[in-house]
From Swiss-Prot:
GO molecular function: flavin adenine dinucleotide binding
Name of the protein described by the UniProt record: tRNA uridine 5-carboxymethylaminomethyl modification enzyme MnmG
A single GO BP: tRNA methylation
HAMAP family per UniProt: MnmG_GidA
Superkingdom assignment: Bacteria
The keyword Cytoplasm belongs to this UniProt entry's keyword annotation: yes
The encoding gene: mnmG
UniProt: NAD(+) binding residues: 274-288
Length: 631
């Protein structure tokens, strides 16, 4: 094909899903001329599966994206139709925000955000090859014959590389929602030396709202007080749409088991790996055979559509079996399927080929993010896109990568898990993956990360000033709580009325608030609150810091120990095969992963404590030969 020079950019982003949008906005907002290429303008920030943002572990990622200056939190705050804080019966370490989105408005808002960004161009085309000179990437070539040159390329291809749809015996190459698929790019990546693999995911059917009997389902309403995803917002309350809960039946199970061999998953047609924590209904029935019923959530896809998403019943069964199966579910007996369920298989990369900066090892200036890296979920994708965008800019500027470690952010946990351990299935973030989750709460993401975002040039002045004001307000209120006191006379009658233990002597509000039964609302009832001048989120911060102070201090000490190993840096040019004392497996793994620190090396499967001791001795020898300077 004849190529023509179509333009020069600092950064080119391939794909405009959740990863691509964050990557392109980050590079453009940091002052670099950016091009984002998508196969369809109608698929920008598409939600091809669940129409929601957030959830357990995922809400934390969105809050962190926002704290660093990303877009996802702002976008969902504009377009949510129901919001719920999950895990409120547990401690704040696992509180996770989740919002149902109007998926069509979400797409429109993100598309408009891209269009309004001065340093960002949008092109509808298909990237078919990565242009390179040796191992240095210099741009991309497209299906329309365009040659775009750039200083960095970010791959955010989602599930579109050689994507194949499965519904029972029916299979065809296509992207989600009847969109096209990328047929040629994988070959170009293999030519560059990338190790590719096949993963699978799936989605349930969408059914017509008017064909559902909601009267036999349980109503699931949103929170009365809505917590925004973005730290730039305070009050975003509006009329919310209800969701509904129903369950499968024994008849559902019978339909599935009778047709199990017709499922693409169980007929042997699909051999790729699917997401463990989002199993198909076939997997649920087989793996949890003792259960005769599984819960399903009925969720609206938007305000101006009658499509309803049936969460919890993704499948690759044939369409006619789907029709029989859905009609065995309480409330769906007469349902009309508008879009059938399907499984989708796609190419992705082995993420152990990535540096922690998300640059491909051995290929200069090529970065990647999102499902291409083996993850699942919009939030995981967006987080990677943001970090890939930041680090593409820093590579252009000749600066060290921007790295968040496991003690600083869920984003740090995500990236460290991917590049250090790899993944054999689509990776999903969960609170249990974060060792320091009491410190890495969603409520303090701005306190942890906004200064960092400002220092690298992504957080703008208005957000930074808001952060400084909140920080000062928290410190001021915390000081007031420590200095202001309550007496038995002031509080005991109310405490006894509420069945709580009276106090014997006067104590500070800080000590009073430490008591399990004392809430900030109780302080306000006693006339001891800060009043309306102090925001709800500032009060929440003070309560959490006060009640969990001992636990947080203990975790901070653990983080200090963790940092000692993280701060012992390893040069990526080290030849591990030349270090005596390392076991053969450790040498191979270390040469492959190329960890940036002793801490990261210690988390590599196959590297033992004895191997770490050898590395520490090696670093000490290097330090001595350099006259005690550095590691």
């Amino acid at each position: 094909m004849i190529k023509f020079e179509a333009g020069k950019y600092d950064v080119i982003v391939v794909g405009a899903g959740h990863a691509g949008c964050e990557a392109a906005l980050a590079t453009a907002r940091m002052g670099y001329k950016t091009l984002i290429i998508t196969m369809s303008l109608d698929s920008i920030a598409l939600m091809p599966c669940n129409p929601s943002i957030g959830g357990t572990g995922k809400g934390q990622l969105v809050k962190e994206i926002d704290a660093l200056g990303g877009q996802m939190g702002l976008n969902i705050d504009k377009t949510y139709i129901q919001s719920r804080m999950l895990n409120t019966a547990k401690g704040p370490a696992v509180h996770s925000l989740r919002a149902q989105a109007d998926k069509f408005k979400y797409h429109e808002e993100m598309k408009k955000t891209l269009e309004d960004e001065p340093n960002l161009d949008i092109a509808m085309d298909e990237v078919v090859e990565i242009l390179h000179e040796g191992n240095v990437v210099i741009g991309v070539g497209t299906k329309l014959g365009c040659s775009f040159k750039s200083k960095a390329v970010i791959l955010a291809t989602g599930v579109y590389l050689n994507s194949k749809i499965y519904m029972g015996e029916v299979a065809f190459y296509e992207g989600p929602n009847a969109l096209g698929y990328a047929k040629y790019l994988t070959d170009s990546l293999v030519e560059l030396g990338l190790r590719m693999r096949r993963f699978k995911t799936g989605t349930p059917a969408r059914v017509h709202r008017d064909s559902i009997d909601f009267s036999v389902m349980s109503l699931q309403e949103g929170d009365e007080k809505v917590t925004p995803f973005s730290f730039m917002n305070e009050n975003i309350e509006k009329k919310q749409e209800p969701c509904y809960l129903t369950r499968t039946t024994e008849e559902t199970q019978k339909v599935i088991l009778d047709n199990l061999k017709r499922s693409a998953m169980y007929s042997g047609v699909i051999e790729s790996t699917g997401p463990r924590y989002c199993p198909s209904i076939e997997d649920k029935v087989v793996r949890f055979s003792d259960k005769t019923s599984h819960q399903l959530f009925i969720e609206p896809e938007g305000l101006n559509t009658k499509e309803m998403y049936i969460q919890g019943i993704s499948t690759s069964l044939p369409f006619e079996v789907q029709l029989d199966m859905y009609k065995t579910i309480k409330g769906l007996e007469n349902c009309k399927i508008m879009r059938p369920a399907y499984a989708i298989e796609y190419d992705c990369v082995d993420p152990t080929q990535l540096k922690i900066s998300l640059e491909i090892k051995g290929v200069e200036n090529l970065f990647s993010a999102g499902q291409f890296n083996g993850t699942s979920g919009y939030e995981e994708a967006a987080a990677q896109g943001l970090m890939a965008g930041i680090n593409a800019v820093r590579k252009i500027e000749g600066k060290e990568p921007f790295v968040l470690d496991r003690s600083e952010a869920y984003i740090g946990v995500l990236l460290d898990d991917l590049v250090t351990k790899g993944t054999n299935e689509p990776y999903r973030m969960m609170t249990s993956r974060a060792e320091y989750r009491l410190y890495l709460r969603q409520d303090n993401a701005d306190m942890r990360l906004t200064q960092k975002g400002y220092d690298i040039g992504l957080v703008k002045k208005d957000r930074y000033e808001r952060f400084l004001n909140k920080k000062a307000a928290v410190e001021k209120e915390f000081e007031r709580l420590k200095n202001e006191r309550v007496t038995p006379k002031e509080v005991n009658s109310l405490l006894e009325e509420k069945g709580a233990t009276p106090i014997k002597v006067g104590i500070s509000l800080y000590e009073f608030l430490k008591r399990p039964e004392v809430t900030y609302e109780l302080l306000e009832e006693l006339g001891k609150g800060a009043g309306d001048d102090v925001s709800r989120e500032v009060k929440e911060q003070c309560v959490i810091i006060t009640k969990y102070e001992g636990y947080i201090e203990k975790q901070l000490k653990q983080i200090d120990q963790f940092k000692k190993l993280e701060n012992k840096k390893l040069d990526e040019k080290i030849n591990y095969s030349s270090i005596e004392g390392l076991r053969l497996e450790a040498r191979q793994k270390l040469d492959d992963i190329k960890p940036i620190s002793i801490g990261q090396a210690s988390r590599i499967s196959g590297v033992s404590p004895a191997d770490i001791s050898v590395l520490l001795i090696y670093l000490e020898q290097i330090r001595r030969t350099r006259g005690g300077k550095g590691e």
